[in-house]
Amino acid sequence: FVPYLEGERTPPLPDARGQLDGLTLANMTPANIARATIEGVLWSLAYGVEVLREQTGEISSITLTGGASQSEAVRKIATAVFGLPIVVTDTFESVAVGSARQAAWALTGTLPDWPVPVISTHEPTEADQRAAAEIMERYRSVLATHFGV
């Protein structure tokens, strides 16, 4: 699933639209479509992580927050998609916390040291890392074929 229902920012494709790729009569089940949707959103994020990695160097882990992070299925899929350790926090309102941190930093000039409790961490297996590299290559191929990226 390519989740560009209202365009996309990374890569910059404001007119792109979502699509399900590789559907057949044999695999077109509600469960497969739901999983493809979750994977598509995570692969879109993984593309952004790859861009960041190219610009800044090594990325050591991914932090999941919010409601979807509470799903064990999402955690497992994210571990496989990113091929990196996944850290799950109990901060459901991460945007509000991030905004408050930025405001405190702007007002004091010092980045606040506010600990965020970690619920769990999930380590990728070697198979996860290999699969992530292969699927990212396929994801980039879909982007190139359909969107010229």
List the predicted regions and their residue ranges:
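Glycine/Thr-rich phosphate-binding loops that ligate phosphate moieties of nucleotide
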Residues: 1-149
